[in-house]
Amino acid sequence: MPEGFQSLNQTLPSAISSIAHLESLNDSFILGAKQSEDVSPGLEILALISVTYAVIISVGILGNTILIKVFFKIKSMQTVPNIFITSLAFGDLLLLLTCVPVDASRYIVDTWMFGRAGCKIISFIQLTSVGVSVFTLTVLSADRYRAIVKPLQLQTSDAVLKTCGKAVCVWIISMLLAAPEAVFSDLYEFGSSEKNTTFEACAPYPVSEKILQETHSLICFLVFYIVPLSIISAYYFLIAKTLYKSTFNMPAEEHTHARKQIESRKRVAKTVLVLVALFAVCWLPNHMLYLYRSFTYHSAVNSSAFHLSATIFARVLAFSNSCVNPFALYWLSRSFRQHFKKQVYCCKTEPPASQQSPTHSSTITGITAVKGNIQMSEISITLLSAYDVKKE
């Protein structure tokens, strides 16, 4: 057996077992378990885990902080889609600043340092952050659906206010769904399947409650993964269908103008789809592993090296989702890329005067266009005011 896996087999049972019961990332945290033998993780493995978590935290905080700063500092970036994306960044920051460091600490020390109250608070924050991420992506997909499939229903006069209200509702719903975690999460006694030891850990239910384990894992998988992604898939199917039809049905005299509008919305929809795909890929192993544990281990936890390796991989991948969104935007959005570079290089130059707010620009355009075709100008203003690709 490779030396790395031999070292893994000798890791603290508490560090292994505390990973074994989680929901979305609400897992069991070790609380000063006494071991039957004096063993500790290999230094190479411990260093690798520590560096990985440090990179996730540092990169995630940097990227999301710059994203939020760009949104509040650059007026042209304060559009409907960007309000949701900024809300998503706040949720990611919450996870990175609280849950990721706590999770990393389990590999450095073998005692839970945050008490019973910390168990409840961390459980609540973890599930709230997951809810904010997936539900914001769902609402953002619905917004793209309305922008492309039903553009005449857009209300630009109060779009920003309504969008802020929706973002707040997403946070409230996420906190309400996470509230039971804070209520029922507590310190329970766990045992190791390969070592004759028991220990206290933070979990949303006692390990001996088979029905609770299975029900909890299924509800988390459905509410925080399957149902939202199914809704998003339905929205994007309708979006793709509409864009395909519009390619062949646009009038010849409006071909150039309509083509620009369609391309603009396609790029924004593509950006949202990439964020959704990143969430789905990053969180799927975590959910699968939790379902497997819930239906397999009821009285003890698996402390094998392979199980530990799979768990660390799933956790790191899930946490990574909180730091990749800003860099996906950097890759997909030219305007965000420009402002991101300015913030990184500490450039304090103000944006050109031509980069006015979408509402101001559309108003001027509307006043000029009224002299020509009033009806068409009103529709064009509505479609372009907050959904121009250069101002996602």
From Swiss-Prot:
Membrane topology annotation: Multi-pass membrane protein
GO MF annotations in UniProt: neuropeptide receptor activity
Residues bearing attached sugar chains per UniProt: N9, N26
Record-linked CDD domains: 7tmA_BRS-3
Record-annotated disulphide pairs: C119-C202
Gene3D superfamilies, per database record: Rhodopsin 7-helix transmembrane proteins
UniProt keyword Cell cycle, yes or no: no
Lipid linkage positions (S-palmitoyl cysteine): C346
Extracellular side: 1-40, 103-120, 184-219, 293-312
One cellular component term from this protein's GO annotations in UniProt: plasma membrane
Chief location of this protein within or outside the cell: membrane
Localization per Swiss-Prot or TrEMBL: Cell membrane
Cytoplasmic side: 63-81, 143-162, 241-271, 333-392
Transmembrane segments: 41-62, 82-102, 121-142, 163-183, 220-240, 272-292, 313-332
Tissue note: Expressed only in brain, primarily in cortex and forebrain and at low levels in the midbrain.
Keyword line: Cell membrane, Disulfide bond, G-protein coupled receptor, Glycoprotein, Lipoprotein, Membrane, Palmitate, Receptor, Transducer, Transmembrane, Transmembrane helix
Job of this protein: The relative rank potency of bombesin-like peptides for this receptor is [Phe13]bombesin > [Leu13]bombesin > GRP > neuromedin-B.
Family of the protein in this entry: Belongs to the G-protein coupled receptor 1 family.
Protein name per Swiss-Prot or TrEMBL: [Phe13]-bombesin receptor
Organism of origin: Bombina orientalis (Oriental fire-bellied toad)
Upper lineage: Eukaryota, Metazoa, Chordata, Craniata, Vertebrata
This protein's encoding gene: BB4
